[in-house]
Curated annotation (Swiss-Prot):
It comes from Hahella chejuensis (strain KCTC 2396). The lineage of its organism: Bacteria, Pseudomonadati, Pseudomonadota, Gammaproteobacteria, Oceanospirillales. This is Acireductone dioxygenase. The record marks 95 as: May play a role in metal incorporation in vivo. Fe(2+) binds at residues 96, 98, 102, 140. It is an enzyme of class 1 (oxidoreductase). Pfam families: ARD (PF03079). Monomer. The gene is mtnD. One of its GO terms (molecular function) is acireductone dioxygenase (Ni2+-requiring) activity. The record marks 104 as: Important to generate the dianion. The record marks 101 as: May play a role in transmitting local conformational changes. Belongs to the acireductone dioxygenase (ARD) family.
Length: 185
């Protein structure tokens, strides 16, 4: 089940808000300028290829492209067996921002987006069928956990794909990690 925790950015001991209600997650995030929605499930084979995944969600992807000017979409998958999983996790764990929206639709699996908005940190557990769109310039980081298991559709306006501008803020090192929050759930 997806969830949202909201913390003061100087105190991660207890969330100010915790909810697993999809409508409440959407409401809280939309009020903060973050798009969050649930898409209908598509039946996909276990070994679905990136092309078959994009074809299954073509209507939704094309709608997002038209609404937001995205030029490309791709599919990224990570499993616990990936030889570079630790490097990838470390790369995404530092607070950064982008010059374009970061859009992810979870086809399967899960991951945590941490959104540093003013004096709060919104921690969003995204799972299968969740779409999150983090506006350009938003300070954030992502934790896939020590044993990542996810497949996501990504959309870009920049043909170079994922390009981060790291903030240098150490806040991400103070926040609870994936394994701690998933264990609590």
């Amino acid at each position: 089940m997806s969830s949202l925790r909201i913390y003061n950015d100087n105190d991660f001991s207890q969330p100010l808000v915790f909810t697993e209600d999809g409508a409440e997650i959407s409401r809280q995030l939309n009020e903060a300028g973050i798009r969050f929605e649930r898409w209908s499930t598509r039946e996909l084979d276990e070994g679905a290829t990136p092309d078959s995944i994009l074809a299954a969600y073509q209507e939704e992807v094309e709608k997002l492209k038209a609404e937001n000017g995205f030029t490309t979409a791709d599919v990224v998958s990570l499993t616990p067996a990936h030889p570079q999983k630790d490097e990838f996790r470390k790369k995404f764990l530092d607070e950064h921002r982008h010059s374009e929206d970061e859009v992810r639709f979870f086809v399967r699996g899960q991951g945590l987006f941490y959104l540093h908005l003013e004096d709060k940190v919104y921690v969003v557990l995204c799972r299968k069928n969740d779409l999150i769109s983090v506006p350009n310039g938003t300070k954030h980081w992502f934790d896939m956990g020590p044993e990542p298991e996810f497949t996501c559709v990504r959309l870009f306006t920049n043909p170079e794909g994922w390009v981060a501008q790291f903030t240098g803020d150490e806040i991400a090192s103070k926040a609870p990690r994936f394994e701690q929050l998933i264990e609590e759930a």
